[in-house]
Amino acid sequence: QMIQDGFNALLNDYLKSNHRRKVERITKAFNFANQAHAGVKRRSGEPYIMHPIAVARIVCREMGLGSTSICSALLHDVVEDTEYTVEDIRDMFGDKIAQIVDGLTKISGGIFGEQASAQAENFRKLLLTMSDDIRVILIKIADRLHNMRTLGSMLPAKQFKIAGETLYLYAPLAHRLGLFSIKTELEDLSFKYEHPQEYDFISAKLKATEESRNKLFEHFAAPVDEKLKSMGLQYEMRARVKSVYSIWNKMESKGVAFEDIYDIYAVRIIFDPLPGVDEKNQCWDIYSAITDIYRIRPDRIRDWVSRPKANGYQALHLTVMGPDGQWVEIQIRSRRMDDIAEKGFAAHWKYKESNVEEDTELDKWIQTITEILESPDPNALDFLDTIKLNLFTSEIFVFTPKGDIKTLPQGATALDFAYALHSDIGNKCIGAKVNHRLVPLSHPLSSGDQVEVLTSRSQEPQPEWLNFVTTAKARAKIDAVLKRVRKEIGRASCRERV
């Protein structure tokens, strides 16, 4: 009965979604997986099939994916844990589901532990599947989220290892794929197992201050509500509390107590666009309405409406002085922007069909990752660190002389910019002009800089370049050339000796 109830809940989630109704296909995948895992129990004592059902529910309800992903989630452990093969899956469910299940089977296991290098290679495979089908990595993140939610039944040593791995790679990946709420939950769950005392301390503080926060929010929201209603807007306004992990991070990095963190809660306004009015303009209309009521802090305006983040995130952020004399951050988003902020890449697909546009920054990021993965560098652990560098950094926006915008990680140099244009330009780069001023290759860039790259045919990548480039692409390209040169020198000296 427990199994049937779990599956019925999954079907209900699916029928509430916007996807085409393919209930028979999902039922067939469930029956196949249920029979394949029959009699097997999880460590918690419940039937094993409850895990694939839970992963499929995350994929459907929290990521907004359709029947292909739901079926693949239901079948994701069949090839690894039972006698069935990828060919059996292909015969029963077709090429696409077989390809996704195959991708998920290849990347089972962790990335830390005795076989760290082999497991890092696993992760390399995982990221390579992103360029073939992003759904592989989305289902892998859903699988990890369910394992984290049920980590309590594991031995403490295993809990610690899985939590560390989640914080190191899966949370940053979820962030980069725009899965904001999943990223936050993965961080908080990892933190709970890695630092239980600190987790309990901050959770207790949040609970103790909840009532006063709610009163502050009501006081703050009343005049804003009145103003927005008078403008005829359909919207919802709610308070969003910072996660336990991000509060702890701020306490650690700033060296402050819980009581000294002023932005523990933010206000989010999500509106349904008025017909015929541009979404961006409506964001700024709401901004105007709020700044008529409260004093703004000009250095805290963040316009991700005109220039979305690389993971697709769009919103207008501002910070104002609330009625109680505390600074309050406000995030203004349309319903579409909110969907993309919460469901990330999955929601991108939904909206991309209707808006034909060039590749998003995320598509470009996936392309960069693919280039790095395909470079013949044998050291998979170095590669993991390189990827990690580029997963969690903030972005800056830099202009070419023709006015094209390039997105780079914070701290990127003129040489990183040259490699972002093309690897040949990077290899031949001798310097740059930033805002018409001559600078060295190591010059760090800032948002809004205009950069012109200077090249020379006789230039070759130098080993010291690795000391100051920050992007994974630049590092991989420089490494590849230096290795090739070392091999050629080695061969030449062998020939001389002969």
Model-derived segments and spans:
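Short, mixed-charge amphipathic alpha-helical segments
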Residues: 13-29, 85-97
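Short, well-structured alpha-helical segments
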Residues: 23-34, 49, 70, 98-105, ...
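Structural motif
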Residues: 19-24, 46-49, 62-65, 129-136, ...
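Generic hydrophobic/packing signal
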Residues: 59, 63, 77-82, 93, ...
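Alpha-helical phosphate/pyrophosphate-handling elements in metalloenzyme active cores
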Residues: 28, 40-74, 78-88
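Internal insertion modules embedded within essential enzymes
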Residues: 3-7, 86, 94-97, 104-267, ...
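Short, contiguous pre-domain boundary segments
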Residues: 1-19
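Active-site flanking loop/helix segments enriched in acidic
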Residues: 17, 29-58, 108-126, 402
